Amino acid sequence: MDRIRIVGGNRLNGTIPISGAKNAALPLMIAALLTEETLILDNVPRLADVAQLQRILGNHGVDIMSAGKRPGDHEYQGQTLHISAASVIDTTAPYELVSKMRASFWVIAPLLARMHEARVSLPGGCAIGTRPVDLLILALEKLGARIAIDGGYVIASAPAGLRGAEVAFPKVTVSGTHVALMAATLASGTTVITNAACEPEIVDVADCLNKMGARVSGAGTPRIVIEGVGRLGGARHTVLPDRIETGTYAMAVAMTGGEVLLRGARPELLQAALDVLTEAGAEITPNNEGIRVARNGAGINPVTVSTAPFPGFPTDLQAQLMALMTRARGTSHITETIFENRFMHVQELARLGARIHLDGETATIEGIETLRGAPVMATDLRASVSLVIAGLAGEGETMVNRVYHLDRGFEQLEKKLSACGASIERIRA
């Protein structure tokens, strides 16, 4: 199993190209199931989750061709995927595929909308009522689907097609919004989604669907209106830049000091996080190339932050901010309001010397001057990259184990950081 070896203490200086957003690329790839024509997606990151979704779509009979420059080539801007779902041969998504990535459950929406049936495994470890799957099922039932759960599978059917309806979510859900949005595009009549998620990735998917012939308005607001159409066609769409990757590298620069241009980053996608970084002492300068992040000389200021749905501070940057605050000049407070059990990185940060106290959903971080390198274990995607950020500023060597989590969401992470002066390398098993 691969590991990441880091020798801390180096400042970061240079340019980091920001990849396409994984959280947009995945639903965009799934949306290709809505049409018999080819959907072309540009700026798709090369990630383990993208590769896994390609396998899942292939299981349904979808043809996918990848083109474009390889990482490391001059002017690399992600891969281009040509996705053709002209002949969907299987409407079953089996457990052995879905269990490896929760977002793969979303294939239920386009399969049901276009083929009028779907049989999709519940994601691994997913209990109805405690994960957002119950909200996804609620949305499909509102649109007229008949749903049964048998043998760990959600079996959905709509023999006469889906019907437009009002889908009112009891709480904001990104997954539920994606599923309702895709399913409603081919439903008869009008669908109104209320309490919809407002994330930029929702807007990106809606923009692509409209290019395919859908009639979606209001994406990016809590109320989305979809006028159903009879069919969707092919289109070409460029995946928006990854705001979580942008925020992660910005926090890495704030942690180590230095100055880095995050090329292709768009500040409006993560303004709340940039405001927190400014409060923490980083210099944030948007320009026509992206966002320049610097911290030269000044220390790191403590902050108090609560995660929130967009446009608030993203839960997917919570672990990275916590790593940064371990070296702040004072006490910081971070409250997690989106997900339960999202402080698994605390124990591993403590191995590097961090002083963190948990009280329910709030972490209190007492900043210290120096972290110490140590072997650590990645527990999930965002936790793993927080350990990398901490290791970049730690004294001595940090070895991050189980880095397959990183490969799910960060394209060429060690190469991007190494190019800016970090002492970081992948040790292959």
From Swiss-Prot:
Pathway this chain belongs to: Cell wall biogenesis; peptidoglycan biosynthesis
Chemical reaction(s) catalysed: phosphoenolpyruvate + UDP-N-acetyl-alpha-D-glucosamine = UDP-N-acetyl-3-O-(1-carboxyvinyl)-alpha-D-glucosamine + phosphate
Record SUPFAM superfamilies: EPT/RTPC-like
Residues binding UDP-N-acetyl-alpha-D-glucosamine, per UniProt: 102, 131-135, 316, 338
GO terms under biological process: cell division; cell wall organization; peptidoglycan biosynthetic process; regulation of cell shape; UDP-N-acetylgalactosamine biosynthetic process
Keywords, alphabetical: Cell cycle, Cell division, Cell shape, Cell wall biogenesis/degradation, Cytoplasm, Peptidoglycan synthesis, Pyruvate, Transferase
Name this protein carries in UniProt: UDP-N-acetylglucosamine 1-carboxyvinyltransferase
Species in which this protein is naturally found: Nitrobacter winogradskyi (strain ATCC 25391 / DSM 10237 / CIP 104748 / NCIMB 11846 / Nb-255)
